[in-house]
Amino acid sequence: MRTGVIAKKMGMTRLFQDDGRHVPVTVLSLEGCQVVSVRDKERDGYVAVQLGAGTAKAKNVAKPQRGAYGKAEVEPKAKLVEFRVADDATLDVGAELSADHFVAGQMVDIQGVTQGKGFAGAMKRWGFGGMRATHGVSISHRAHGSTGNRQDPGRVFKNKKMAGHMGARNRTQQNLEIVRTDAERGLLFVKGSVPGSKGGWLLVRDAVKLPRHPEAPYPASIKSAANTNTAPADAPVETPAEEAVVDTAATDGAQES
């Protein structure tokens, strides 16, 4: 079981296929999705990877959390999520995941908070048919009707479908297809719609009810590995021959002096 990723919903568009068909897609953006911490079975009792995405101002982050980010040597994140993984699917702290973590044609599950609709009646919220327009019905055309019996059971059952706040719930949509990926720009193109509003954070995982795509990288596709002391790309690298010439010149100068 691999880790998922944290993505931001950018909006919808369409993509044209080779046969001329156009497919409606939702564009998801991976914005600095990095490993912040790793849970170990010996220390924590389970194996998981903690990912962070986006950026947050340090003054808006709690002091203990700032210490955790400083220990991991990553910038404060706007969204922090933990993914349970297999024992051989852990990642190094500071590693940044790429959009190539998923491949075209792969099925994924996407979790997010649905769009809030405010207080809605039973007809809009639950699809009730409503009552008759005439034949003795007055005032109650869009009412949900009876909510229970009389003395028995003497109460309204839990989860009775009634009017109330609609939307703004954490929901998971399963078996959505990845149409295309753009690793350079960090974009995922998912067929159809996904939960949430524009700018909302989503959790994208491998489909739990289907086998993993054979071409999906395991344990992950890493864009960059942080926390490594590497020389700058523009720094000149001396070859052994050049080093020998420099040492000889220094020795000759010392003998002449």
Swiss-Prot record:
GO terms for biological process: translation. Signal peptide: none annotated. The modification N5-methylglutamine is found at residue 151. Keywords: Methylation, Ribonucleoprotein, Ribosomal protein, RNA-binding, rRNA-binding. PROSITE patterns: RIBOSOMAL_L3. It comes from the Bacteria. GO terms for molecular function: rRNA binding; structural constituent of ribosome. Part of the 50S ribosomal subunit. Forms a cluster with proteins L14 and L19. It comes from Sphingopyxis alaskensis (strain DSM 13593 / LMG 18877 / RB2256). Methylated by PrmB. This is Large ribosomal subunit protein uL3. The keyword Ribonucleoprotein applies. Pfam families: Ribosomal_L3. Residues 225-236 have a biased composition (Low complexity). The keyword RNA-binding applies. Belongs to the universal ribosomal protein uL3 family. One of the primary rRNA binding proteins, it binds directly near the 3'-end of the 23S rRNA, where it nucleates assembly of the 50S subunit. Residues 218-257 are annotated as: Disordered. GO terms for cellular component: cytosolic large ribosomal subunit.
